[in-house]
Amino acid sequence: MSSRTIVPSLFASRESYRRDAEAIELPASAGKPMSISYSELADLVHQVRAQLASWQLPKGTVVCSSLVNSLEFVVVFLATADLGLVAAPLNPNYKESEVTFYLEDTKTPALIVPAGTLSGTDASEGALAAKRAADALSVRVVEIVYGAKTLQLVDANGASTPSADATEASEDDTALILHTSGTTGRPKAVPLTHKNLLTSMHNIKLTYSLSPSDKTFLVMPLFHVH
């Protein structure tokens, strides 16, 4: 990744500082405990970015996902944003009708789901509901499959072939779309640029005096505004 002022560039900067520093730790309670270094995270993001590039989506296209907090979630977001696409993470517990609304609202051509969703094996009801909604709208359903420090995007036609032909994001490009809760009406999309996210992250770092030696414990769902 380059030194561009976009969200994924933070990890490139940290990677050059210390490639073997731990970036993500998944505890045993996560189901598949593991530790991922910044170097390994960068490699995974490059892998998924190259596969997304093979889809040849125009810059600014929204790519939805329905994933729980996981390594896959983090990599999909970073790869999508780095490519100049827009990540739109959905609550993995949404009902089919709710997923339908968000797919239609974002006009996404693709929905990324957990491994096992296409076959229906070892898939949550939320993942299956997301697939049904996507199928009804002819939205491409793609699994994100982890194995031996690799991540593969797989749909009904097989695995995506990596491509080097790709666009790049800038700080004023939208990186993320979140939706309001809709408690007083229909949920509304809230676009956040790379610059918005970087500013927020910088403020959090200053507020809590965070340093490279600190570790944060994530308990909130990544798809939510926080």
Predicted regions located by residue number:
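Conserved pre-ATP/AMP-binding loop-to-beta segment of ANL
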Residues: 19-22, 159-179, 185-186, 209-215
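Conserved structural elements of the adenylate-forming
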Residues: 42-47, 171, 190-211, 216-220
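Short beta-strand->loop structural element characteristic of the AMP-binding/adenylate-forming
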Residues: 64-66, 73, 77, 81-112, ...
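Conserved AMP-binding/adenylate-forming core of the ANL superfamily
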Residues: 23-78, 95-100, 168, 192-194
